[in-house]
Amino acid sequence: AKMASTVYYPAGMYDAITWQDGSKLSAADFVMAMIMTFDRAKTNSAIYDEAAVPQFQSFLTSFKGFKIISTDPLVIKTWSDAYYSDAELDISTYWPSEPTYQYGEAGWDIISVANLAEAGGELAYTADKSTSKSIDETNFVSGDSLTVLAKYLDQAIADKTVPYAPTLGQYITADDAATRYGNLKAWYA
């Protein structure tokens, strides 16, 4: 790789930063962002979206890998062949927000619920998929999407869904999932 970036997050970050529903930021939020970088562009994914493929293919031309060195404090190292003459632009943070999520910051629990709705064929992350499948585009602010998301939130609560369990199960227990989904439900109500 032509560039390596190591990001050291502050000790105590998980206690100091909370989501809108009071849930604490966790390493799982970062890992979910890593997963989502890849999953929507994979043809065998339940949330595959061909609109995600071009950006993903471009990303793969320079991406070489990443490694979580530590979860507390969080330290993430990334290798890439893409680099800029201004070093501060070479940092890969995996902060759970744009560009991975095209609508701002989001915790793993919110993305999990939206993924369930997308896998269920009721919502789509992109306008392209929404149009081609004749379904609503995911909207976390208003519209019919909220009713669909509420339904899948109830499902996630009932199932204590740990999304991408083989990977995120290393960072989330069923009890963690129940707490996060419960906080989201209370905030939404």
Where on the chain are the PLM-derived regions?
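Aromatic- and charge-enriched surface segment that lines or borders ligand/interaction sites
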Residues: A1-A46, T78
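Surface-exposed binding/hinge segments that line
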Residues: Y8, I47-Y188
